[in-house]
Design a protein with these regions (language model features):
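The alpha/beta-hydrolase serine catalytic core
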Residues: 14, 110, 122-226, 230-256
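Short beta-strand element of the alpha/beta-hydrolase
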Residues: 27-35
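Short beta-strand immediately N-terminal to the catalytic nucleophile in serine-hydrolase-like folds
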Residues: 102-104, 129
């Protein structure tokens, strides 16, 4: 999918955040949060956008600074900064009366969880896809060797190789992640909460989705374990499941 009809949102007078807003004049807006070093033009946002267009729902997607076509250096980004960017964009582009449904992919679920308290009165549903809250500490730092940790602590960039991708990891990224812990907090929102996770996810264990379920005490929870699904959950069958769950949440909101 291309960046057709996307625009830039200016933050702090210098960071330009790439975003796309589908305005169907609906009372419901679906917001998509992409993952670590990902973008807004993949299969999931594409399919969700098509669903929203067909079902008369507003849809907002965007790219954090240092990602995709947004400006800024990736190595200067962190969870706090990306959360703030998402908050400012949502507040600027969406009407205050809009009911929100957040969809977080991998790291996007962490950003979403950070924003639960901010939008608690408007948030009416959440879908997490291969959710990875606090992954910087549990999937990176704790597994790094002493040699790698020494490189990072010396304020150097460690390039983490993962398949075809290279992730530049910095000290400030790791340390900022520790300021954004969410798994020790209780979430008391009474909203539909659906977590989808593939059994063949080699990046993020199922336990991360289970951890979210544990802290959401009052939500109407559903855990969808997808057989043979990988981390991206971008097969046609995966995308259909995601949109089916979204449809259920939307129907519940409209019937309320």
């Amino acid at each position: 999918m291309s960046y057709k009809k996307s625009k830039y949102f200016l933050i702090a007078r210098k960071r330009r955040i790439k975003y796309f807003f589908l305005n169907k004049n609906s009372q419901i807006t679906v917001v998509f949060f992409h993952g670590f070093m990902s973008d807004m033009i993949g299969a999931k946002p594409k399919e969700i956008q098509k669903f929203c267009n067909k079902n008369n729902l507003n849809f907002l997607k965007f790219e954090y600074s240092g990602h995709g076509k947004s400006t800024g250096e990736f190595t200067k980004g962190n969870i706090s900064k990306w959360t703030k960017e998402a908050k400012e964009l949502i507040n600027s582009k969406l009407k205050k009366k809009n009911k929100l449904i957040f969809i977080g992919s991998s790291m996007g679920s962490w950003i979403s969880l950070n924003l639960f308290p901010v939008f608690k009165k408007r948030l009416k549903g959440f879908i997490g896809i291969g959710s990875a809250p606090e992954f910087l500490e549990h999937l990176m730092w704790k597994k790094f060797s002493k040699k790698i940790k020494k490189i990072i602590l010396a304020k150097k960039i460690y390039n983490l190789e993962n398949g075809d991708f290279t992730y530049p990891i910095t000290k400030q990224l790791i340390f900022d992640g520790r300021k954004n812990k969410v798994l020790n907090n209780k979430i008391n929102l009474k909203i539909p909460l659906v977590l989808l996770h593939g059994t063949n996810d080699k990046v993020v264990p199922l336990s991360f989705s289970r951890a979210i379920l544990k802290i959401c005490k009052k939500s109407k929870k559903k855990f969808v374990i997808i057989k043979n699904g990988d981390h991206s959950l971008s097969r046609k069958s995966d995308l259909k499941k995601i949109c089916n769950e979204l449809r259920d949440i939307v129907n519940n909101i409209r019937l309320a």
